[in-house]
Amino acid sequence: MENQGGDYSPNGFSNSASNMNAVFNNEITGRSDISNVNHQTGTPRLVPETQIWSMPVPDQLMTMPNRENTLMTGSTIGPNIPMNVAYPNTIYSPTEHQSQFQTQQNRDISTMMEHTNSNDMSGSGKNLKKRVSKACDHCRKRKIRCDEVDQQTKKCSNCIKFQLPCTFKHRDEILKKKRKLEIKHHATPGESLQTSNSISNPVASSSVPNSGRFELLNGNSPLESNIIDKVSNIQNNLNKKMNSKIEKLDRKMSYIIDSVARLEWLLDKAVKKQEGKYKEKNNLPKPARKIYSTALLTAQKLYWFKQSLGVKASNEEFLSPISEILSISLKWYATQMKKFMDLSSPAFFSSEIILYSLPPKKQAKRLLENFHATLLSSVTGIISLKECLDLAEKYYSESGEKLTYPEHLLLNVCLCSGASATQSIIRGDSKFLRKDRYDPTSQELKKIENVALLNAMYYYHKLSTICSGTRTLQALLLLNRYFQLTYDTELANCILGTAIRLAVDMELNRKSSYKSLDFEEAIRRRRMWWHCFCTDKLYSLMLSRPPIVGERDMDMLTDQNYYEVIKTNILPDLIDKKEDLDKITDVNSALNVVVNFCQHISLFISYYVSKLVSIESKIYSTCFAVRSTLDLSFDAMLDKIKDLNDSLNNWRDNLHVSMKLKSYKQYLSVLYAQKSQENPALSFEIACSRVLNCHFRALYSKVILSMMTTSLLIDNERLYKGSRHDIPQLFILFSSQYLNASKEMLQLFQGINYQAHMYNEVMYQFSTAMFVLFFYVVDNMNDLKKKGEVKEIIDILKKSYDRLVGENDEQLLFDNVKWNTLIVFYSHFLKYVLQRYHALNDSTSIFDSKPYDETITKVIMHSRKIKDETVDQLIMSLKSYGSLHSLQKGNEADLADDGLNTNDISSEDFAEEAPINLFGELSVEILKLLKSHSPISNFGDLSPSSNRKGISDDSSLYPIRSDLTSLVYPIHSSDTGDTLSSGLETPENSNFNSDSGIKEDFEAFRALLPLGKLIYDRDYSFVNTFRDYE
């Protein structure tokens, strides 16, 4: 039956309101329901579903907006639901229907291919947005009409208006679910059969034309294939472009998200790290409270040495040579101090100051030459030989020109040091330095040294309170060197403190004070400040005292400062081309240039010494400062110690070839052979001695740091479990490190040609290594596993001893009390160690200790002679002052013109109270005690009892049994109360620790020492001894 109302047959499309609404209305569901129509009819899709939604819709078939058809409640709407459809204005008759339909269909295809934007609707005068097959997520959410996506902005007009992203996530999810349902639906047998039947008849044929139904295109027609191919290609290209852009955007977003996440992780880690530092500073356990010092040889350690070796001799026999050399040295020092305090002020006659007379001019010049030849490394560059000779010329000139106080001080210090140096020269094989027939005796030289020193002390007291210029600073630095080598470091430190104070007053610690000076004067002042700074750090470690100057108190001696000095003042004279000069941009490249010129080698060496001194300063502040164990936790302290150890290793590894031990002699010899120098032999000797002294100083720092670390670990066993460090590994590292460094120092000493002034330069570091190796041998002599290592160390000690005293004891006797004391301790320790070693190893040869006893006797007799001569000088000075008569009242029988006859005087002849008092007037009793040969007994009231330490209060840095790694392995024990096992002790020492009478025995042992204390530890500590007097 003909249907003129526009309805289609059930198997085709219908023009009814319900079908049209189901096909084209997507306001709610976001998609057309044409797929449902296809499923109902059973006809296959000619265009893939993903492409159908983007196909343009003919304007003639667009539905008009109407309230009834804007909201759809489902996809299965009945066919009788009304729908307003805009039909064409001209209605054709049924006979013309087919031809008109073909014409209209071609027109629609052209419209689809051109993507027309016309939104005119038949029957409506309004311009509406062109309807699209799917709405974006934003329009769907707001329930507004969506339009086509702009190709430039990739957004619909609504998203452009609201500045929002235009996405279709909701639609994509619906399509994905739809595909899954279709796949599941077609998997059934019935559907498969239906699908196969549909494929055989892809397009349902229409009924007779009179039925009023429009016939669809035949699937096999060329027009239909062209349409489908064009539409498919267009959509595929669009999809590929869109997918590519989405993938790129997705990758960018993923990268941004990952970057943000990593940034958050880094920030969180940084916050936790800062919190960890705060926690470590405040909450982590701190080491046991203890103020460590660099002391090595103490009364407790001396007692342990005797007990560990199992010496059968009594305490009196064991301490006899030690007590005697210490008593002699103490009397000698007291005599010298009384001369400085009482006789350094000249006498007044007729309102004229009468100073001690100096030697003749020729002799004075010869002494000054010897003094300059033996300066070597300690005060290199402080004063030139020309300056010394000019002072002598001015002093002895007949023009009557007088010297100023600073010049008097400088001249007397140089003559005093020259007389002391000449005494060592005339004893050895260094007589090649002599140019004339001046051959003074030892007595003459000692007299010159004595009077020049008294004159120098007179001017020192005049100038020590006022800054008078560089002459005074030169003299103070030279006087400091003399006291350190001849007397003790404590006395020298007092002179150094005055020198540093004057240097700071002159602003030598600031770069700005050098700007207006010429280069030579600036270098001279720079050298003086360098010596102040480096000597201060050395004394700080030796005395366990805080340094006077810190790095924050100056802007000198930095890398930048060295670079500026070299680049501005030195390189322009060495490099002609400006292009080559511009290539030097840092201190290392600048130093690589100046090292090839011998006139600048001193500046080159000073740079590396300055770097080492900075490390020494950090070692003191970390390990030996008063608050070291209060401010730092146990782990933080170990962290800093490891960094310091790495700094020492890096310093040595990064040395220039001219500073390395294996090559410095070859490099410097070639350098000085090629360049002309005023005295190339002396310059070469000075440069070599500075390099050697630098290495001894570095090895000493490593020994001190390593021993302190092992002592710290032993003292804090309770903190092993909570530590994040590998304690056993650290213990083994530092225990072997101080041992190897000590052996290297002695082996290095064996390669030094004998020169007394050179030996004096390294005597403190050498004695440190010597005592460390002695203690190690005693500590491990009973360990069979270390038998070979102990034998090796004993051989090193014997070779070093032979090198020290020389063949046939030619270098044995020396007019230096510190040197003689070292020889006595070395001989005494080596005798007992060799005796014990031969006894343990069942040697067939009998050990003969007689050579060592004879050496000790020779040294003690020579030291006694030096002390007696010093006392005689004091008596002669008293006679010259006229003060001797006041002391002879009531004692004429005891005093004679040739001195005091006190050979038969013993300590029992004196009063019970301590007679030696530096801060009182001289008396006959004091002179008798100073001249007597008896040891000084233990006077109980000399030192306050509160300052006396028991056997358990050992301040020695050497750790007992520090080599046993089992000491640190209780970290693995489950019992938190575990302590050091007593099984670690040797049989001899088990009784040593368990005997209840040890304390009394130690007190009796210590009472045999002069004044009840050990005043020698690689250097004398006289000042503290007399400071404790009450």
Curated annotation (Swiss-Prot):
InterPro entries, per database record: AtrR-like, Transcription_factor_dom_fun, Zn2-C6_fun-type_DNA-bd_sf, Zn2Cys6_DnaBD
Positions of modified residues (Phosphoserine): 221, 937
Record's GO cellular component terms: mitochondrion; nucleus
Note: Present with 238 molecules/cell in log phase SD medium.
Region (Disordered): 185-208
Residue ranges with Low complexity bias: 196-208
Main location: cytoplasm
Entry function: Putative transcription factor involved in halotolerance.
Keyword annotations of the record: Cytoplasm, DNA-binding, Metal-binding, Nucleus, Phosphoprotein, Transcription, Transcription regulation, Zinc
MF terms in GO: DNA-binding transcription factor activity, RNA polymerase II-specific; sequence-specific DNA binding; zinc ion binding
The protein's name in its UniProt record: Halotolerance protein 9
CDD domains to which the protein is assigned, alphabetical: fungal_TF_MHR, GAL4
Residues annotated as transmembrane: none
BP GO terms, sorted: DNA-templated transcription; positive regulation of transcription by RNA polymerase II; response to salt stress
Coiled-coil annotated spans: none
Location relative to the cell: Cytoplasm; Nucleus
Keyword DNA-binding: yes
Regions recorded as binding DNA: 136-166
